[in-house]
Curated annotation (Swiss-Prot):
The gene is bgaB. Keywords: Glycosidase, Hydrolase, Metal-binding, Zinc. It catalyses: Hydrolysis of terminal non-reducing beta-D-galactose residues in beta-D-galactosides. The lineage of its organism: Bacteria, Bacillati, Bacillota, Bacilli, Bacillales. Belongs to the glycosyl hydrolase 42 family. This is Beta-galactosidase BgaB.
Length: 672
């Protein structure tokens, strides 16, 4: 479902914070800025339903009509992001409880237990009232369910959750004996005889059973997803043709977004990279991940900031031009919408110093609003991009349940974190402008030539066979250290590490050697010496050949990186955390073998992506440098700059510092 036929542009709008005369001023400013969509009513439950069962829509009717009269459509919030004070007073047991028994209070946001029965009842009534009220309004283009689910309270440990957890476990395991087997409860005498003996993994004297913890991640994810589906069912019934979504948060650990994405009509997400970090590589990685959740379907960036946030220790603004630059970088990786939090900067409340499209003081020379207007007017020229896709020959495996499991306590290296390992491999693709998708281990891999599996600690039943077939059919599988270790219940695969991946990789890992943070070792390969940190595997070859060996410590000379021929393909194992230079060279060698090339050869810190329709190819080029760069385009092509409309023959192209180009590619005859 496309929300609009053009690039969506706008932001969260909270008119309940402002007097009515400001609403008219806002609508005019939106029109001038090129805004065509706003998210409305997200935190308005207490305004829409000021007391139990009493609804007031008059103010919202007026706001929607004003916006529609000025050409602005609505992504209408279901207002369930924060329960009202009257609800909390009436149902104090709806407040969430942490693992130590501390009850969270009203006065912030997201202060509810997802398994409270009255919460669900009241949500159903509210959502149906909103849907019935606005189902026929021509301004309604999309539903915004709740807001940033689990952002502040991702787990509740109350009695409602305990009861629901036991029910969830019964449905999953059927018998208490099966649960005991899966959880390994004979260890430390944790065996259960009855379901009602099981509680959430609350604060305990020492390590919680990791299998129980892992299942509680799954349970809370499912509980919160059930809340979303409760709202979606009502909205789909009342407005079957209006897209339904909720805003994700990129690499947000508590929620399995691959699972969630199957239930939204379009992926939307919120992104707040820190300007102090320079090149926004993790922002790019998350854009690729969000695009991949629904197999390449374009997504909407639902929130970003024009300038600065308010919740870091030091909240620096984006320098001039960077907001525009990063917006185009998001479009380059598959976005069909660029939205902000929020439209008008709040006067009061916890986010009053969070940047906005309209700052506290606005005049015609204000940099923020000027950049907002420039971007909005430019995006009107890019309707041609809506619905276009990105084609990738490389995939990185990203698995939320694996993430949960690998970061549970009592591991060989308890400071090891999943995202930095994934990002280490992604960074080398980003620097080389190689398009990449993210996939699950069970996904169809036939379209890819190379699949990278960073720290695939958990391998579930059937996933190894999927990877085995990929390699046997000619693919290259690159697997990092600490992979193939456990099953879906965090039970070790017996028979030697890396468990079910041993035959693909042709190795046996005898021991782990986790490194202190300050330790640096070296690895040798046929093209030089490289640093390695964090981890070393003691590897015995079972058919594989060494590509690099360790230089130091008692395992000097043993393999660090290996390659194994399997079927028509190969399995490469990286048994340490090598530096960027080595990873880059390794990947370049693999890509050369598969004839995978950069989209364009460009200078450092120049980002290039290609979006395609059945008819056209579009190059989006982002110069993150603060100086001009020159790049070469194929001379047998003709290009049209979609921002200024000019056509030119390929050859030398200059792009100013902190600037972009969006080019449509033609051949000599003017066609693709």
């Amino acid at each position: 479902m496309n929300v609009l036929s053009s690039i969506c542009y706008g932001g969260d709008y909270n008119p309940e914070q402002w007097p009515e005369e400001i609403w008219y001023e806002d609508a005019k400013l939106m029109q001038k800025a090129g805004v065509n969509l706003v998210s409305l009513g997200i935190f308005s439950w207490s305004k829409i339903e000021p007391s139990d069962g009493v609804f007031d829509f008059e103010w919202l009717d007026k706001v929607i009509d004003i916006l529609y009269d000025h050409g602005v459509y609505i992504n209408l919030g279901t207002a369930t992001a924060t329960t009202p004070a009257w609800f909390v007073k009436k149902y104090p047991d709806s407040l969430p409880i942490d693992e130590s028994g501390v009850i969270f209070s009203f006065g912030s946001r997201q202060h509810y237990c997802p398994n409270h029965p009255q919460l669900i009842t009241h949500i159903k009534r509210l959502v149906r009232a909103i849907a019935e009220r606005y189902k026929n309004h021509p301004a309604l283009k999309m539903w915004h369910v709740n807001n940033e689910y689990a952002c502040h309270v991702s787990k509740c440990f109350c009695e409602n959750c305990a009861v629901a957890f036991r029910k969830w476990l019964k449905e999953r395991y059927k018998t208490i004996d099966e649960l005991n087997e899966r959880w390994g409860t004979n260890f430390w005498g944790q065996r259960y005889n009855h379901w009602d003996e099981i509680n959430p993994p609350r604060k305990a004297p020492t390590f919680i059973n990791p299998s129980q913890e892992l299942d509680y991640y799954r349970f809370m994810n499912d509980s919160i997803l059930k809340l979303f589906l409760t709202e979606k069912e009502i909205l789909r019934g009342v407005t079957p043709d209006i897209p339904v979504s909720t805003n994700f948060m990129g690499s947000f650990k508590p929620l399995n977004y691959f699972q969630w994405a199957q239930h939204v009509d379009i992926v939307t997400w919120d992104s707040y990279p820190d300007p102090r970090e320079g090149l926004p590589i993790q922002h790019a990685m998350m854009n690729d991940l969000m695009r991949s959740l629904r197999k390449g379907q374009p997504f909407i960036l639902m929130e970003q900031v024009t300038s600065h946030v308010n919740w870091r220790d030091i909240n620096v603004p984006k320098p001039p031009g960077v907001m525009r630059l990063w917006s185009y970088a998001t479009i380059a990786r598959g976005a069909d919408g660029i939205m902000f939090f929020q439209w008008r900067q709040s006067r009061a409340g916890a986010e009053k110093f969070h940047g906005a499209m309209v700052p506290h003081f606005l005049n015609e020379n204000n940099r923020i609003y000027r950049e907002v207007t420039q971007l909005g007017q430019e995006l009107k020229k890019l309707d041609c991009l809506v619905g276009s896709r990105i084609k990738a020959e490389v995939a990185i495996i990203f698995d939320w349940e694996n993430w949960w499991a690998v970061e549970l306590s009592s591991k060989p290296h308890n400071k090891l974190r999943y995202i930095p390992i994934v990002e280490a491999y992604y960074r080398e693709l980003y620097k080389r402008n190689i398009a990449v998708d993210f996939v699950r281990p069970s996904d169809d891999l036939t379209k890819y030539k190379v699949v990278i599996a960073p720290m695939l600690y958990m391998v579930k039943e059937g996933e190894d066979e999927n990877l085995r077939q990929f390699v046997a059919n000619g693919g290259t599988l690159i697997v990092s250290f600490f992979s193939g270790i456990v099953d879906e219940n965090d039970r070790v695969h017996l028979g030697g590490y890396p468990g079910p991946l041993r035959d693909i990789l042709g190795i046996f890992v005898e021991e782990f050697v986790p490194y202190p943070e300050t330790k640096v070792n070296k690895i040798y390969s046929n093209d030089g010496e490289y640093d390695c940190t964090t981890w070393a595997d003691i590897i015995r070859l079972e058919g594989a050949e060494p590509l690099a060996t360790f230089k130091g410590d008692w395992y000097a000379g043993l393999p660090a990186v290996t390659r194994n021929c399997y079927g028509k393909g190969e399995g490469i194992y990286v048994g340490t955390y090598p530096d960027s230079n080595y990873l880059g060279r390794l990947l370049e060698q693999v890509f050369a073998k598969h004839h995978i090339n950069p989209i364009l050869e460009v200078a450092e810190n120049v980002e290039v992506q290609q979006r395609e329709t059945d008819e056209w190819k579009y190059l989006i080029i982002i110069n993150h440098n603060d100086y001009e760069v020159t790049l070469s385009l194929p001379e047998d092509k003709i290009y049209q700059n979609m921002i200024d409309g000019k056509c030119f023959r390929g050859g030398e192209l200059r792009i100013q510092g902190v600037d972009v180009a969006v080019l449509r590619e033609h051949d000599e005859a003017g066609k693709v």
